[in-house]
Amino acid sequence: MDTSRLTLNHFLSRFQLLRPQMTHETLNQRQAAVLIPVVRRPQPGLLLTQRAIHLRKHAGQVAFPGGAVDSTDASLIAAALREAQEEVAIPPQAVEVIGVLPPVDSVTGFQVTPVVGIIPPNLPWRASEDEVSAVFEMPLAQALQLGRYHPLDVYRRGNSHRVWLSWYEHYFVWGMTANILRELALQIGVKP
């Protein structure tokens, strides 16, 4: 599938046609969720954040809004929506959730569930300075181009795992964020 002319309707029909298979087994017990905010435009965008530099984990990294599930969250989707509101001021009622991707294991011991949602283009999103240093929009068509991601095999604690790397403008997109974007591309039928 060629992503260069990806419209929102095409993305939605492909995502809903090819439902994710939730067969992923994990040993992780801690749950987290991220929102993949797709901006409703004829040529859709993807809202991403850059984490604040003072954070203990993943400082300065490009990420989706999200975080750990807490005891007040009714579901993984509720956790993703709460975190998106806290981090970038996206009201939960403004998000049209269209589905979830299979969970991904993080190197920090979380099982992370990506929640795909459509958001209006005119939301006055803003970064929570405690958690986020920047909020930016990337064209969805570019984010889903598999050729933009480059593999790097990393050895950590005696184990090898593959990390994906990419750039968008001056932002370095890698790790879990790049992996989730690749999984989303594969989910809608983009061929490697």
UniProtKB/Swiss-Prot annotation:
It is an enzyme of class 3 (hydrolase). GO terms for biological process: nucleoside diphosphate metabolic process. Keywords: Hydrolase, Magnesium, Manganese, Metal-binding. Its cofactor is Mn(2+); Mg(2+). Residues 29-160 form the Nudix hydrolase domain. The keyword Acetylation does not apply. Its EC number is 3.6.1.-. GO terms for molecular function: coenzyme A diphosphatase activity; magnesium ion binding; manganese ion binding. A motif (Nudix box) lies at residues 67-89. InterPro entries: CoAse (IPR045121), NUDIX_hydrolase-like_dom_sf (IPR015797), NUDIX_hydrolase_dom (IPR000086), NUDIX_hydrolase_NudL_CS (IPR000059), Nudix_NudL (IPR023735). Mg(2+) binds at residues 83, 87. HAMAP family: Nudix_NudL (MF_01592). Probably mediates the hydrolysis of some nucleoside diphosphate derivatives. Belongs to the Nudix hydrolase family. PCD1 subfamily. This is Uncharacterized Nudix hydrolase NudL. It comes from Salmonella newport (strain SL254). The gene is nudL.
